[in-house]
Amino acid sequence: TAGSAANIRLLSKNYIEMGIAQADLINDAYNGTGIFVSTQCSGYKAIAALYPEACQIVVHNDSGINSIDDLLGKKVSIGESNSGTEQTANLILQLNGLSDKLVDTLNYDYTTAAGKLQSGEIDAFFCTAGLRTTIIEELAQQCPIKFLSISDSCSKKLESAYDTYVDYTIPANTYTGQTEEIKTVAVQAVLLASNELSDIVVESLTEFLFEHSADLQYSVPVNLQLDETSAVYGNSNPY
């Protein structure tokens, strides 16, 4: 799908039985705020927060872009329409005083955005995803890239407006050529289930997730964090 918002809408209309979405968008959908102000969604519950999704802002290494402020007047992909990445990107740009009139924002999926950054058709792209994001690592192996950090003032404003966001550090050497750690923010990716699923199915799935989290880690490219504390962190909606 196009991402978090699409998954939430599909769940609420019973087109799908399960989906993953960013915690901030789940809260907006449940409360009828943000992009869901006129289309409050219901009909689903959270199973567990699975892993943190880090906001990664990627630019070419020799672009001369060294901070979010430098994105003024630049072509920037903010993720697909109705995606969690789009919401996060818009919030961060706005908190840095960069409205869509000051930045040429474009809606590309990650693969397209990476290709256009490499070819010089765009100047930067946002990617909100679990580490180590495959498309970014593949890009890093093909051309020199770097990441923009999010300032303390921006992260504090974001976390004040949305308690689903937390400070996050991308460790050095997470990606090829990335020798310094990156200060950013992260939001939990939460597994949702339709209310139409039986309690037995949901309970069995939840039990399987927690009992086999170590085994599941080998089959996914993200750092699963499944324990009783992290599973409910950053999401205030019903489980």
Q: Which residues does each PLM region occupy?
A:
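Bilobed "Venus flytrap"/periplasmic-binding protein-like clamshell domains
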Residues: 1, 52-119
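Short, glycine-/small- and polar/acidic-enriched structural segments
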Residues: 1-73, 77-80
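Conserved residues at beta->alpha junctions
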Residues: 2, 80, 126, 195-196
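Extracytoplasmic/secreted envelope proteins and their assembly/folding machinery
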Residues: 5-8, 12, 26, 44, ...
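Sec-exported extracytoplasmic/periplasmic mature domains
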Residues: 12-16, 31, 76, 94-98, ...
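Short, acidic/turn-prone active-site loops that include or flank metal/cofactor-
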Residues: 24-25, 83, 151-154
